[in-house]
A protein has these predicted regions:
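Bacterial Sec-dependent N-terminal signal peptides
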Residues: 1-22
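Charged, low-complexity intrinsically disordered segments
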Residues: 20-159
């Protein structure tokens, strides 16, 4: 019995030291408002309708720490088959800010771009549309944003 207790303790410690589950990472690193992703916009609509469409609370899916709203039952079912395809890059934070300086900056969900079947969201307030700046140096900013986002994710998996 004592051996079982020690084994369970070691398992818990190793999970804490060597990695976090996806739910914990999302809850601590993703751009969520009370657990809601993309301010309630439908992630599938960006791809299928090529526009930002507000989702409905009644068409929600909880996925590893984040709740997504959908504008239609069809979009909800599509998402459930493979959520990672439709989730925004960098946890839903501004792609430009992530690339420029590794900062988590809120977004305007209606300012977005899809590149290589990946959804990028951008800050667009106070006459500052960061999508325009992103487009001027997209390749470089994308590379840096990937590196910076990985630092956030890796900080969750190290003691």
């Amino acid at each position: 019995m004592k051996l079982l207790g020690i084994s369970q303790f070691l398992l818990i410690v190793s999970l804490h030291v060597y990695g976090q589950d996806p739910t914990t990472i999302r809850k601590t690193q993703y751009n969520l408002d009370k657990g809601i992703a993309i301010e309630g916009y439908d992630p599938v609509a960006y791809f299928k309708q090529q526009k930002a469409i507000k989702g409905k609370k009644g068409l929600a899916v909880y996925d590893e720490g984040a709740t997504y709203y959908f504008s239609s039952q069809e979009n909800k079912e599509v998402f459930k088959k493979n959520p990672s395809i439709y989730e925004p890059q960098y946890g839903g934070w501004c792609a430009y800010a992530m690339g420029l300086g590794g900062e988590k900056v809120s977004v305007d969900p209606e300012t977005f771009k899809i590149v290589n079947n990946k959804l990028y969201l951008f800050y667009n307030r106070f006459f500052n549309n960061t999508l325009k700046s992103w487009n001027k140096d997209e390749r470089n900013l994308n590379t840096k944003a990937d590196q910076n986002w990985n630092k956030f994710l890796n900080s969750q998996t190290k003691p």
